[in-house]
Amino acid sequence: MGTHVVSIDSAAAHVTGGTYAWERKLVIQFTPEEMPAIVATLMGITPSARFTNHGADKSKFIEVRRQEGGLVIVTGDKAASYSVPVPTRTAYYVLDLFCRAMAMSQNGPGRSASDILALVRVVHGF
């Protein structure tokens, strides 16, 4: 089984052409311990989740924050930061991705998305 996590790749948008500078992309991987906090934010239990000290030099960060009309995912390091709005209609797929990764991890075999959502609600709920 192994450990399944979610990885985010970010890159600057080119001014023309609607393309991205993937050759200078920033890659950040959520740890298994961080993923429930992201699910709590996606569920609306918490307003945001921010994690720092990622990468070899500990300069990378990622934040998921609820905002009017959906969420925003902000990634960065000491050289750049990228902000990507995620509309409400798309947030469902992000939540599904996190639930599937958590269900597939070695601590989650046999757990359904409902089980994971219930666990997150208990841990992060009010």
Where are these regions (language model features)?
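A cross-kingdom feature marking solvent-exposed beta-strand/loop segments within repeated
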Residues: 12-28, 77-84
